[in-house]
Amino acid sequence: MKDFLTRPAWIEIDLDKFENNMKEIKKMIGEKTELMSVVKSDSYRLGAIPLSKVSVDLGIKYFAVATLSEALILRKEFPEINILVLGYTPENLFEDAIKNHIILTIYSLDDSRVLNKKAEELNEKALVHIAIDSGMSRIGFTTCEESKDQIKEIFDLKNIYVEGIFSHFAACESDPEFTKRQFEVFTSFVDELKEMGCSFKYRHIANSLSVLFHPEYNLDMVRPGIIQYGYTDSDHLPEEYSLEGIVSLKAQIASIREVKKGETVGYERFHKCEKDTKVVTLPLGYADAFPRILSEKIEVLINGKRCKQIGLICMDQMMIDATGVDCEIGDEVVLIGKQADEEIKIRDICSYSSDCETSFITHFHGRLPKYYFKDKKLVYSNEMD
């Protein structure tokens, strides 16, 4: 029994693997390209503070989040780093952003004027990166003449410092031709702005898959996200790089019972036992990360043996067919990670639904405690906050 547990279902994060992943990414991009670590949604629900501490110790200076609230949490812990909010920030939050030296994404001349006025009132310079829509059709200035004129006007605002300009790939692996076109649209537009006197310290468009498969698109800065944590949302990984998943998800057996042939298991009597079955119950369910669509599809590891989940996954519990496997209440079960010679990968789980690794990870519920290990020793828990 692990004496640090506060719940019999939990996540373990390997900080050594995370550190190795960050070193590998730095090796991929080289010394001339700045690495902006994407830690939005609390580092994809894996813990922005403990993971960013590792990155800061490795010399990484730039971080990206989705919202100002995420940026302010980071700023409280890391007063010296540079933090970019990738998404929209409402005008009423401009003052907090300026006072805390948060870099904002801008794609509106009107917003820029309001931001400039607020910075002037505070006797500060507002820091911004300009977003360009090169084909994602999400946010950003379009690449038209009017946009160039508006961006030039933003450059002329005295209390705004335009540090960077960026765009985002829509289909980096699945549509390389469209990706190339996006890159060309973006860089051509930036070159045209430069001819108008608008120069940028950082140009960035490369995301995780671009970093892996298209180093020619790195420019001055890259924004790796999911690959930092050892996952790719891809069927392929370049052999020269060693990225490892940092997550293990485990639970303890809560119940063991013998169910007779012909009897049923779970809600709606969804599973009918075709033989006498040893049914193990685990204390986690769809409120923790495993949606019902995965019912009767996933496997878990019990004492090194693969065992099938049976019945409908419940909100807080799921049942497992452990027939023929020696086990006891309290035994550790692996739902993601390694046990003995077997391994359950997040990608395996995602193959049973339309989900991707990025999406699956961000469904890890806050009630699952997270424990962080370095050199196989527990060094931090989100319960210490």
Locations of the language-model features?
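Active-site anion/phosphate-binding pocket segments in diverse small-molecule metabolic enzymes
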Residues: 2-15, 19, 69-70, 89, ...
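Conserved PLP-enzyme active-site core in the AAT-like
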Residues: 28
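Active-site-proximal beta-alpha core segment in soluble small-molecule metabolic enzymes
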Residues: 2-5, 10-12, 17-20, 31-204
